[in-house]
Amino acid sequence: MKERTIQPVNNGLNGNITIPGDKSISHRAVMFGAIAEGKTTIKGFLPGADCLSTISCFKEMGVDIVQNGDEVTVVGKGLEGLQEPKAVLDVGNSGTTIRLMSGILANTPFFSCVQGDASIAKRPMKRVTNPLKQMGANIDGREEGTFTPLTIRGGDLKAIEYTSPVASAQVKSAILLAGLRAEGVTAVTEPHISRDHTERMLEAFGVKVTREGKTVKLAGGQKLTATDVQVPGDVSSAAFFLVAGAIIPNSKLVLENVGMNPTRTGIIDVLEKMGATFTVEPINEGASEPAANITIETSSLKGIEIGGDIIPRLIDEIPVIALAATQAEGITVIKDAHELKVKETNRIDTVVAELTKLGARIEATDDGMIIYGKSVLKGNTVNSYGDHRIGMMLAIAGCLAEGKTTIEDAEAVGVSYPTFFEELQKLAK
C-alpha cells in the first residue's frame, strides 16, 4: 500500500495541462471496435488500469488489439466473431467493463465467467443482470446474480422496453448492447438522462439510435462498421484541477482538450453557480464528442444547493465538489446522490470521514452531504480506501492544507489518471 506525502502549495498552481483521455469513451472505443467489422484506430486512449482491463478481456475473446501508449488499434471480429474465453474474464477494478461487457456477452452464444477485484465483488450487478435475464440471457452469480463472479451463457435474446429505476449509463449501455443482436426494438427509459457516450459512439459506428426524451431505442440486427475514434480529455479528471485552480490561492490553470459532452458537464455548471472565474474555448465544434480548453483562476466561491437532474451529470465529481464547498462562504447541500453509495467506496461516507480528518465541517445525509464553509484545512494522514477519485480529491486538499498531508493507498489514482501526481508536482513549481 503506497503512501504519498503532499506539502502545502504556497505559490499556487500555474501552467498548462493536457487532460488524459476520457475513461468512459476509451472503454467504449475498445469494446465497439472489437464487435465492429474492420480496423478501428483510437487516439487519445486512456492507458489507466481500468481501460487496460477492457483490452485484456477482449484479447481473451480472440480480438487482435495493439496498444502503444495512448494509441490503440483494434481489428474487429464483428458481432458474431468473438470466441469463447478459455480463462475467467478479469475486469480488475472496472465497473464499466463488467457492466457493459455483460450486455455483449449476453447475446453471444458461448459460456463465460466474469470477475473483478474486492471492490467489484461488493458492487450491485442485479441492476444489469435482471434486465438482461428479462431479454432471455442465462446469467448467475452470488446471491442470485447480485454479486460477482458472474457466469453468462449468452444466446438468442428478445428486445424489451425497460424502465430503469436509476439513471445509470452502465445499465442503459448494457441493455442497448444486448439489444444489438436481440429480436425487435430495445428501449430504455431512465428517471433522468444519464451520460450518452454509448449512443453517440454507436451512431459513429453506423448504428441507428433513436432518442425521445428520457427514452433511447435501437433495433436489433444492426452491424457496427469500424471507424477511427479521437478521445477527448476526461472532464472527470479535469474536475480535480478545475477545483484546484479555483480554491488554491495564486493559481491560474489552462486545461487543454477537456471533453464537454453536455451529459457530463455538471461540474462546469456548479463551479459557475458557486462563482468561479473561468473561460471555456471550444476547440472541435461538430465532433461527436465536443471538447474545449478551459482557463480557471483563484476565485471567491459561495455555497449552493446541488440536486435533481444535475446529479447524473456530475456524480463522479461530487468528492471534489465537496472539497470546493469547504472553501466556499456559506452552506453547500448535496442531495439526490444515493448512487454515491455504490461506487468504488461508499463515497458519502469516505468523503465525509476523510475531509473531517483534515478539519472540514461536513456531515453525511442519507442521499448526500452538507458542507459548512469556509474551513481552514490542516494536514493529517488520510486514506483513499482504493478509490481513485477519493485519492485525487485528498491530494488537492493536501495542497491547500496547513502542514503535510499523507495519503495512504495513493496508487489507486492510477485507475483513471496514471500521471496525476507528476502533473500536480509540475504545476506547483
UniProtKB/Swiss-Prot annotation:
Gene3D superfamilies hit by this protein: Enolpyruvate transferase domain
Coiled coil segments of this chain: none
Record has Amino-acid biosynthesis as a keyword: yes
Keyword DNA damage among UniProt keywords: no
Keywords (A to Z) from UniProt: Amino-acid biosynthesis, Aromatic amino acid biosynthesis, Cytoplasm, Transferase
Binding of 3-phosphoshikimate, residues: 23-24, 28, 168, 170, 316, 343
E.C. number(s) listed in UniProt: 2.5.1.19
GO terms (BP aspect): amino acid biosynthetic process; aromatic amino acid family biosynthetic process; chorismate biosynthetic process
Subunit description: Monomer.
Similarity remark: Belongs to the EPSP synthase family.
Protein name: 3-phosphoshikimate 1-carboxyvinyltransferase
